[in-house]
Every structure is written in C-alpha cells, then in structure tokens.
Amino acid sequence: MSGNRKIVIDFKKILPFAVSILLFVVLFIRMFSYKEHISDYIGLSSSIISSKLLTFIVLLGIWLEYTAVLIVVLRPFFEIKTIKNSTKYITPFIFVANLFLLKPSVLLLTGQDNTLLTVLLIIEEALGLVISIYYYVKEFKTEEINYKSILVSLGIFGAMMLASMPVYFPQFVFGLTKLQMIPKSLTPAHRILLYGNILFPVALYFLLRNKSQGVINCALIYISLATLIGYLLPYNYQTFSEPWTWPFHLCNTAMFIIPICLVFKMKRLFYFTYFINVLGA
C-alpha cells in the first residue's frame, strides 16, 4: 500500500458551492457599498421616480431580489423540493427582471446614479442566473416537470418572502399610519406586535415538527439569514469607522451569532447565546 495518496478534487461538484458562497459575499459587499436613501421615502408619491406604478414594481423587485439570492445560495447545500423548484422556475425570472430594472433600482436605493452599486448588482444578478441555469440544465433530463409541485413551491416562496421583506417596504408603499404605540399601554398596535412575536415561533414549530432535519435546518438558516439582511440594511461602509454604531447589544449580536450557529452546527455557542440573551432580557 502506497504511503502517498492522491487527493482528487472534483471541480464540477465544488463549483456550485463556490459560486453560491461568492454570491453571498457579493450581496454583503453590495449592501455596505452605498448610503441608502430608500428608507427616507414615505408613500409612493414621495418617490424620486415619477411613476407610482414603476416605483412599486422596482420596490417589489428589490424585495424579491433578497428572497431569490438567499434561495439560490442555499440550493447547493439542500436537496429540498421547494428550493429546487424555486431555483429552476422562479428565481431566473427575478434576476432577469431586475437586470431590466437596474437603473431605477439604483436610483431608488441611493437617490442618484451609483456606478459601483450598478456593477455589483450586475455581478449579483449574473451569479444568481448562473446557479439557476446550472441546476435547470443539470436536472432537465433527470426530473420531470410537476406543475402541481411548482405551484406549491410558488406558494411557499410567497411565504418565504415575509422573512426577507425590507423594513422600509410598508412605509414606502402605505406611508405612515395614525396608530401609535405607547410602551406602557397595550394599544391595538402594541398588542398585534406582542402577539405576533409570541405566535410566530409557536406556528413555526408546528409547521416544521414533522419535517425532515434537512427541511428544518434549511428553514431556520433561511429565516436567520433573511432577518440578518433586513437588520443590516440601514448600515453602510461608514459603519466600520464608527465603533459606537456597531451592534454590541446582546440582541444585536444574536442576529449574527444565530446564523453562524445554524450554518456551522455550533450547539454550545447557540445555548450560551440563548442563556445570555434570556438573562439579559
């Protein structure tokens, strides 16, 4: 038996994972590359784009982009029907549509033309399309098209969008409301917020309790990454030079630690974070 063993690297198998990780890195660089202006708008009529319809379409495209990117990023790591169908039949259309909406998207996000953001968005759309087309071609001959399964995946995709909704979307579309939340008074708006936070994890438990471990892992990783992206949207490159704005609060650090624990299966760190946050609360 020879003492020298050759390590054979199958680049065809590694490539989807490498492109997926690269896409995620590009997304984060893109998010921090500009000072966002989009959260300043209140109602569609306040948009820098003259057409309300185009403003809404672009705003929806930006929202769909976050959902689509996270789905194709997770695709190489999970063989789940919804993720597979979404990657092949839904995300390609989103990436192509956002290429056509590139200029108004940049204008809405920053309030002006931004060459760096434009280039990063093009790279992001291209990488997303590469992954989507790769899996469509790869599975074209081996898997039959099941229209019922695609419709179910489309419905689940809609539910997945809730986790990736940008925080500025309701304000931009509907404007400000007359409802007020007084911290020490259980107003209707305050009750909805409290009950929603209590019911969501309970509902999620019952939805996932009979699913495979792969589905559970995928769902939790997706939710944690989507909410992390939503949390990071107001930040930009200047944040790194302003330590007083860094997320050192326990609840804020948990936004970063939970995805790390789920992705790398770090149970001890998870329970330590859980204990510290409960103690802090």
Model-derived features with residue positions:
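Alpha-helical transmembrane segments of multi-pass membrane proteins
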Residues: 22-38, 160-171
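Hydrophobic cores of alpha-helical transmembrane segments in multi-pass inner/ER membrane proteins
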Residues: 60-73, 121-138, 191-205, 252-264
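A glycine-rich, hydrophobic loop/mini-helix early in the fold
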Residues: 213-259
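Short, Lys/Arg-rich, polar N-terminal cytosolic tail immediately upstream
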Residues: 1-9
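Short aromatic-rich membrane-water interface segments that cap or initiate transmembrane helices
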Residues: 45-60, 114-120, 181-193
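Extreme N-terminal leader/anchor segments
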Residues: 65, 105-176
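Membrane-interface helix caps and helix-loop-helix hairpins in membrane proteins
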Residues: 105-115, 236-245, 264-268
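Membrane-interfacial loop-to-transmembrane alpha-helix junctions, especially the N-terminal start
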Residues: 12-20, 79-93, 146-152, 212-225, ...
